[in-house]
Regions:
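Alpha-helical cap/lid subdomain in secreted, periplasmic
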Residues: 1-119, 123, 127-141
Length: 144
């Protein structure tokens, strides 16, 4: 949204219409944030959006994730943590339960709202973020 609360581009991404203008504007804004936060040779770890149990919401979130992933791919110092893949079922769709990498047991990872992660899901996500940090430290010569 703009400062005056108006929408920069009037479109609902993922709704089936032409979202080219929306994607372009969102990419511009996401890229600017990435460049700002990742400046001065800093590594930015960007955590993606998980899918939702509502297919309409998921369609919109997928568009956002696609744009963010494309912008991250243009920037070697941006690491994208893919929550979509981590918290999806075998078919790539919404999953309430996923395999916990700590013990390989399938567990409930979602809050009751069908989107947010519960404590177990947050712990699994924290493992992925920690791994991204370790990988970056190793790339910088750290003994991790």
């Amino acid at each position: 949204r703009n400062i005056d609360k108006s929408w920069a581009v009037q479109h609902n991404p993922g709704s089936g219409g032409d979202d080219t203008d929306w994607r372009t504007e969102y990419a511009k804004r996401v890229g600017a944030v990435m460049d700002y936060l990742g400046g001065d040779n800093r590594t930015l770890i960007w955590v993606g959006i998980p899918n939702d149990d509502n297919p309409d919401v998921t369609a919109r979130l997928q568009v956002q994730n696609e744009v963010v992933m494309a912008e991250a791919a243009k920037r070697p110092k941006v690491v994208f943590v893919d929550t979509w893949r981590r918290f999806s079922g075998l078919s790539g769709g919404f999953a309430e339960y996923v395999q916990d990498p700590r013990d390989n047991v399938v567990k409930d990872v979602r809050a009751d709202d069908g989107f947010h992660l519960n404590e177990t899901g947050a712990e699994i996500l924290a493992l992925d973020i920690a791994q991204a940090i370790r990988n970056e430290l190793r790339a910088r010569g750290g003994a991790v």
